[in-house]
Regions:
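RNase H-like nuclease fold core
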Residues: 1-103, 123, 266
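Short alpha-helix boundary/capping motifs
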Residues: 69, 125-129, 145, 299-302
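Acidic/histidine-rich catalytic cores and adjacent linkers
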Residues: 35, 76, 83, 87-95, ...
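Conserved beta-strand -> loop -> alpha-helix junction used to position metal-binding or nucleic-acid-contacting
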Residues: 84-141
Length: 323
């Protein structure tokens, strides 16, 4: 089946079959491809793309609202309800979602929020390294001859080693789970630098915010205490302003709904597959070609289970024939 026929089927039989098993939870995202933009909606529990639209310009609120209203109309025709929607931290979505779906729970992708926070923590660690390197004494040329010069040389070497260790093991400040050996390494490289140990403690508290065992209200109370702690952390607190972003509260919405996914991995996976397809399948990138290729990809994914069953049946038949 060609791309044009695949596009026609996606709007008809494919959507009917996909919505027969609709979970009620979706993920929405935009993919930029040169002058074009692909808007996608994916079932966030079955990981199945439901609909898409290819634009020849960067989307605005009107484009997003029109796209969502088209999908909402498809749900209403089938008497289906949307239970929750997950997006990234883009400003494109909050207003159109409110206009189209009302007060439906809107979850911001946990990974996108944590990514920004880990970048802030790493930036704070880099600031400490720069401050530490600035304390390195200036040495005269040649070998140190006096006792004072030798003492300064030893101090400079210790500082260089400390800065190097902090740079080499900087990932320990943001890694989610540390092994006992990694914790010992972290204690060693942060010896004499209490602000760095506080930095790691802040990151631990950030990860605890997303613990499914607590409710959103409890997580918000934890967040308020954490923000108070950061405000008192005068030395490098200014580099952690991401903790005060309103997106952080929106990323905790999933805690009140066990079925609401905390990430938009479902739609991100489809975007990655599209990027890979571009590199290996075709080079002509026009609006119509992109739309056709995505339709073919959706059709191929729909038939993946049937292909697997056919392959397994053939393998079993060959095995019996060989026996």
């Amino acid at each position: 089946m060609g791309g044009k026929k695949a596009e026609q089927r996606i709007r008809g039989d494919y959507l009917d079959a996909a919505l027969d098993n609709f979970s009620g939870y979706i993920a929405a995202d935009e993919l930029y491809d040169g002058p074009f933009c692909v808007l996608s909606i994916v079932d966030n529990r079955t990981f199945r793309r439901l609909t898409y639209e290819v634009l020849d310009h960067d989307p605005d609120h009107a484009d997003i609202e029109r796209f969502l209203r088209t999908f909402q109309a498809s749900l209403q025709r089938r008497e289906l309800l949307l239970q929750g929607i997950t997006t990234d931290g883009s400003n494109l979505y909050p207003e159109p979602i409110l206009q189209v779906f009302g007060n439906v729970p809107h979850q911001l992708c946990e990974f996108h929020v944590i990514k920004e926070l880990t970048k802030a923590v790493l930036h704070a660690g880099a600031k400490v390294r720069r401050e530490l390197a600035a304390t390195r004494p200036k040495l005269s040329r040649g070998r140190p001859s006096s006792a004072t010069a030798r003492k300064a040389a030893r101090q400079a070497k210790r500082i260089e080693q400390k800065v190097g260790d902090l740079f080499e093991h900087r990932y320990l400040f943001v890694q989610h789970v540390l092994t006992p050996a990694q914790r010992r390494t972290l204690l060693r490289v942060t010896r004499g630098r209490p602000e760095l140990r506080t930095l790691r403690g802040i990151m631990d508290e950030v990860y605890r915010l997303f613990d499914r065992r607590c409710r959103t209200d409890t997580a918000l109370e934890k967040l308020a205490r954490l923000r108070g702690r950061v405000r008192r952390f005068k030395r490098i607190g200014k580099t952690l302003q991401k903790l005060f972003s309103p997106n952080l509260e929106k990323a905790l919405t999933f805690l009140d709904d066990k079925l609401l996914p905390s990430t938009s991995n479902a739609v991100e996976r489809g975007n990655r597959r599209h990027r890979k397809m571009q590199k290996t399948v075709y080079r002509v990138r026009t609006r119509s070609h992109i739309a056709s290729r995505i339709a073919l990809d959706m059709q191929r994914e729909e038939r993946a289970t049937q292909r697997l069953l056919t392959t397994q049946a053939l393998h079993c038949a060959r095995g019996r024939a060989a026996a």
